[in-house]
Regions:
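N-proximal low-complexity "stem/linker" segments adjacent to membrane-targeting elements
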Residues: 1-51
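Membrane-interface aromatic/basic loop that binds lipid-linked glycans or pyrophosphate carriers
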Residues: 7-10, 299-404
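Cell-envelope/extracellular polymer assembly enzymes that use nucleotide-activated donors
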Residues: 28-31, 59, 217
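A conserved acidic beta->alpha catalytic loop
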Residues: 49, 64-73
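Short beta-strand/loop segment that forms part of the nucleotide-sugar
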Residues: 57-66, 86-91, 115-116
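Glycine-rich, basic loop-to-helix element that forms the pyrophosphate-binding segment
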Residues: 90-106
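Donor-binding/catalytic cores of nucleotide-activated saccharide
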Residues: 95, 116-232, 237-255
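Short aromatic/hydrophobic "clamp" motif used to bind/position activated sugar donors
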Residues: 111
Length: 404
């Protein structure tokens, strides 16, 4: 084809190449990605608090995941009124894939993945972005609280066990803390800002096949490769939570996915040569999370979850390649050891037998204690009666006996 027909000669730079050279590498400071699925009850609150950010140089990419309510209509109305808003309408592809779509489209120097039913402090992006730039961070997390939707109250979020490695805004990484890095922050993605180039270079994406804890996988992958991680302690995200029954139903439906999440994390670590350096951190992270989830699962699903681990996943996760002292908590070690030794039915029989034995011991101990208490009372009563008899005996003596 003649170059003259294209409007430039062979010696000249193509217009699109010239535009690429003159355009900034990152047109936005931050890309905000929000996957949306049937969130019309709270979507406006999320959108309004994002668009009211004090840092204004951001793009908001909303990925509607085939909503059947008014979510898409709400998103389109915001896009009409604010040029920073982009709406991507998808079929029901799942939250992980929806986030990946937003990640592919992102043009911000940093990226954050928020939830469509949460709400945010106006300084969220400004504080995280400035902190990331000042400290040259790959990942920065913020403090958050939980908003109990039904009771309309805020609950302080629990501190992570090894969150102190970021005390006073310290910068940490897997190099300084290989035994703790995966437990140093939550597995939530919605309270973290990531450097986009870092995510792209390391090819970190959400696993589309995961229905729960897809953000845990993403966060673990990022923490395992990041050179500079920190956090701010301001509460900038308000995460909406619902009643316990809602959570129980979620675990009941998808509990079989939990070991798969951690196995995928292990596979990622192995591909990148990070499993051996972070093996102790991965052990305690995966075992303690599985133990916690086991305790949250409804009683009628505990056996499935237990036997899933017993029949291969616990071994695949590497739990039995460690010594007792590698486990940070005895109850987590007991959980992992019992899974390796027993099926759920066998474990339950032993547990109930142990409870019965403890009950018998407690009953016998209580009986002995009660007997001792009664005996002590009887001795006190005897001494009192004896003393009382002596006192009254003096007054009952005849006058002449008293004179003598």
């Amino acid at each position: 084809m003649n170059n003259e027909n294209l409007g430039y000669t062979a010696d000249e730079i193509k217009p699109e190449e010239q535009a690429e050279q003159t355009a900034p590498k990152w047109p936005y400071k931050v890309s905000v990605v929000i996957p949306v699925y049937n969130a019309d009850d709270y979507l406006r609150s999320a959108m309004d608090t994002v668009l009211a950010q004090t840092l204004t140089e951001f793009e908001l990419i909303c990925v509607d995941d085939g909503s059947t309510d008014k979510s898409l209509e709400i998103l389109e109305s915001y896009a009409e009124n604010d040029q920073r808003v982009t709406v991507m309408a998808m079929s029901h592809i799942g939250i992980g894939t929806a986030r990946n779509k937003g990640l592919l489209k992102a043009k911000g120097e940093y990226i954050i993945f928020l939830d469509a039913d949460d709400f945010y402090e106006p300084t969220l992006l400004e504080v995280l972005y400035n902190t990331a730039k000042e400290k040259n961070l790959d990942v920065v997390a913020t403090g958050f609280d939980l908003y109990e939707n039904k009771k309309e109250r805020f609950i302080k979020s629990p501190e992570e066990e090894h969150g102190n490695i970021y005390a006073d805004g310290a910068v940490a990484s897997k190099n300084e803390y290989p035994d703790f890095i995966l437990q140093s922050t939550t597995g939530y993605v919605w309270n973290k800002l990531f450097r986009t180039a870092f995510i792209q270079e390391k090819e970190i994406v959400f696993a589309p096949e995961l229905y729960v804890f897809e953000d845990v996988y993403f966060v673990c992958c990022a923490l395992s490769l990041a050179d500079r991680v920190s956090r701010v302690y301001e509460t900038l995200v308000h995460h909406r939570i619902y009643h316990q029954q809602h959570r129980a139903r979620l675990f009941k439906k998808h509990s079989n996915q939990v070991p798969i999440v951690y196995l995928k994390v292990k596979e990622f670590l192995m591909r990148h040569g990070m499993y051996i350096p972070l093996s102790k951190s991965f052990l305690n992270f995966s075992a303690s999370r599985c133990y916690k989830i086991f305790n949250l699962i409804p009683a009628d699903k505990k056996d499935d979850f237990w036997d899933l681990l017993h029949n291969g996943y616990a071994d695949s996760l590497g739990w039995y390649r460690h010594e007792v002292h590698d486990f940070e908590h005895h109850d987590v070690y007991d959980f992992a050891a019992n899974i390796g030794l027993y099926t759920f039915d066998e474990y339950e029989r032993l547990r109930l037998k142990g409870k019965l034995k403890n009950l018998k011991t407690m009953t016998l101990d209580a009986l002995k204690k009660k007997i001792k208490q009664l005996q002590a009372k009887a001795r006190v009563r005897e001494r009192w009666n004896s003393l009382k008899g002596k006192i009254f005996g003096v007054f009952k003596k005849k006058p002449e006996q008293a004179e003598k």
